[in-house]
UniProtKB/Swiss-Prot annotation:
One cellular component term from this protein's GO annotations in UniProt: cytoplasm
Pfam families: NDK
UniProt EC number: 2.7.4.6
GO molecular function terms listed in the Swiss-Prot or TrEMBL record: ATP binding; metal ion binding; nucleoside diphosphate kinase activity
Function noted in UniProt: Major role in the synthesis of nucleoside triphosphates other than ATP. The ATP gamma phosphate is transferred to the NDP beta phosphate via a ping-pong mechanism, using a phosphorylated active-site intermediate.
Cofactors demanded by this protein: Mg(2+)
This protein's name: Nucleoside diphosphate kinase
Annotated GO biological process: CTP biosynthetic process; GTP biosynthetic process; UTP biosynthetic process
Subcellular location: Cytoplasm
Amino acid sequence: MTVERTFSIIKPNAVANNDIGAIYARFERAGFKIIASKMLRLTREQAEGFYAEHKGRPFFDGLVEFMTSGPIVVQVLEAENAVQRNRDIMGATNPDNALAGTLRADYADSFTANAVHGSDAVESAQREIAYFFNESEICSR
């Protein structure tokens, strides 16, 4: 298998609930290397740009409002088959449908406040990583 990079966000609810360390521990136990990380607070413009593909959908405004409501932690994860493995660890987007032991089952507060975001494909991972990080901030190890 090929080593891939994927992009992940720990969302405002999980940051506010002090779940960052627990989520990072889960990533590392699952074999991911965290090769870039930073905490920031999205502006409305940044959130709208990041989620531009959802513009016009009924949940867009609420998502942007939520994602700008507090700090987030963005990270680049590296592992074999990273995109799919991270999606498996996150669980279903709707936490009511997430399997026990997944990040969303354990840390989500609601459908919107579902604790984490992860890239859905290698191509989107590349785009999302570039949105938040330049190459000098990414440290493969």
